[in-house]
Design a protein with these regions (language model features):
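Conserved hydrophobic residues forming the short capping helix/wall of the S-adenosyl-L-methionine
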Residues: 191
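Core catalytic lobe of class I
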Residues: 1-186, 194
């Protein structure tokens, strides 16, 4: 409750609160503020999980990304290219290179909207410096999806500073909060190494 009160106080009306979790914590997280819950993504890590548990349960290679907000969220869908353009309309056999065919008024689609599964490998975890460290690419994706360039991103569980690196790569400002001095030092070092 106290954390939600702070989130409500500082979040913009169209801002997103983006939290990562795994079951059973995901369910508890959603139920802790069902009123602000919007939806979730599944992050397919493609690698990971504990092989020690593989004989009693499936190896977990996914994690939940849970989205909360006050109102209608800013959402910038990150499109993925189609292998072949698809035309929709009366004359859908006619495909042009432009997004709108001037002659047939058909809409030509060259991209897909995102699905709720984010496919970003976490294979480079050999160099991780925090037990729950996420790939920079995952945070870049989420930051681009829910913010404009120049906006401010808060990470109140900053760990090794991955959010800061993703913000620097996507031209966003950031505030990091981390309670363990060891990880503050690691985050500062990573940021200093990234900034030219």
């Amino acid at each position: 409750e106290p954390l939600w009160a702070h989130y409500k106080r500082i979040i913009k009306d169209n801002g997103a609160i983006v939290l990562t979790a795994s079951q059973p914590f995901t369910s508890a997280l959603v139920m802790s503020n069902i009123k602000m819950f919007k939806y979730d993504w599944v992050w397919n890590k493609k690698k990971g999980g504990s092989p020690l548990l593989s004989k009693i349960q499936p190896i977990r290679i996914s994690e939940d990304v849970v989205i909360f907000g006050k109102g209608k969220l800013f959402y910038n869908p990150i499109m993925t290219p189609r292998d072949k353009p698809v035309s929709r309309g009366k004359n859908k056999g006619n495909i042009s290179e432009t997004t709108n065919n001037a002659f047939t008024k058909d809409k030509v689609y060259t991209e897909y909207y995102p699905k709720n599964i984010i496919e970003i490998s976490n294979a480079d975890q050999n160099n991780r410096v925090h037990p729950t460290q996420k790939p920079v690419a995952l945070f870049e994706y989420l930051i681009k999806t829910y913010t404009h360039e120049g906006e401010l991103v808060l990470d109140n569980c900053a760990g090794s500073g991955t959010t800061a690196i993703a913000c620097l790569k996507t031209n966003r400002n950031y505030i990091l909060i981390e309670q363990e001095t060891k990880y503050c030092d690691i985050a500062n070092k990573r940021i200093a190494e990234f900034i030219p």
